[in-house]
Amino acid sequence: MAPIKRGDRFPTTDDVYYIPPEGGEPGPLELSKFVKTKKFVVVSVPGAFTPPCTEQHLPGYIKNLPRILSKGVDFVLVISQNDPFVLKGWKKELGAADAKKLVFVSDPNLKLTKKLGSTIDLSAIGLGTRSGRLALIVNRSGIVEYAAIENGGEVDVSTAQKIIAKL
């Protein structure tokens, strides 16, 4: 599938999971409930605890979350194929456990990732097929206003600073 681009409708699937900010067990995140009513940023990463994601990509979003939200964004969605428990632990490790507007979402079967056209094959280094690195701005009508798709494992066009400049 071709990568998502500006002007495309953000896809939905019933096969993504999260642990609610108030805690509890993992459950499905019903994307269709907010895709047409909320403005949000999507950040897709290849894997929790991987050095580029942990040291370069996500820290900028955590540090700049108040600034991003001040631009009219309702929340930031972080997508990875890791399970919800791993993502909860990673969020805590990143110092963002209390950031309720930063929602870590598990896409275990890559259904959303495939609809975004953003898979990356890391089989050569033992990681299999993963979510590719990207960042999107989605408006309150569910339309992608900005799409930044990284080339391979780079961390450049999808950084928080680049997204803030587009908000």
UniProtKB/Swiss-Prot annotation:
Residues 4-167 form the Thioredoxin domain. Its EC number is 1.11.1.24. GO terms for molecular function: thioredoxin peroxidase activity. GO terms for biological process: cell redox homeostasis; cellular response to oxidative stress; hydrogen peroxide catabolic process; methanol metabolic process. Induction: By methanol. Pfam families: Redoxin (PF08534). A motif (Microbody targeting signal) lies at residues 165-167. InterPro entries: PRX5-like (IPR037944), Redoxin (IPR013740), Thioredoxin-like_sf (IPR036249), Thioredoxin_domain (IPR013766). It catalyses: a hydroperoxide + [thioredoxin]-dithiol = an alcohol + [thioredoxin]-disulfide + H2O. The active site is at 53 (cysteine sulfenic acid (-soh) intermediate). GO terms for cellular component: mitochondrion; peroxisomal membrane. It is an enzyme of class 1 (oxidoreductase). Keywords: Allergen, Antioxidant, Membrane, Methanol utilization, Oxidoreductase, Peroxidase, Peroxisome, Redox-active center. It is a peripheral membrane protein. It is found in: Peroxisome membrane. The active site is a conserved redox-active cysteine residue, the peroxidatic cysteine (C(P)), which makes the nucleophilic attack on the peroxide substrate. The peroxide oxidizes the C(P)-SH to cysteine sulfenic acid (C(P)-SOH), which then reacts with another cysteine residue, the resolving cysteine (C(R)), to form a disulfide bridge. The disulfide is subsequently reduced by an appropriate electron donor to complete the catalytic cycle. In this 1-Cys peroxiredoxin, no C(R) is present and C(P) instead forms a disulfide with a cysteine from another protein or with a small thiol molecule. Belongs to the peroxiredoxin family. Prx5 subfamily. Thiol-specific peroxidase that catalyzes the reduction of hydrogen peroxide and organic hydroperoxides to water and alcohols, respectively. Plays a role in cell protection against oxidative stress by detoxifying peroxides and as sensor of hydrogen peroxide-mediated signaling events. This is Putative peroxiredoxin-A. The gene is PMPA.
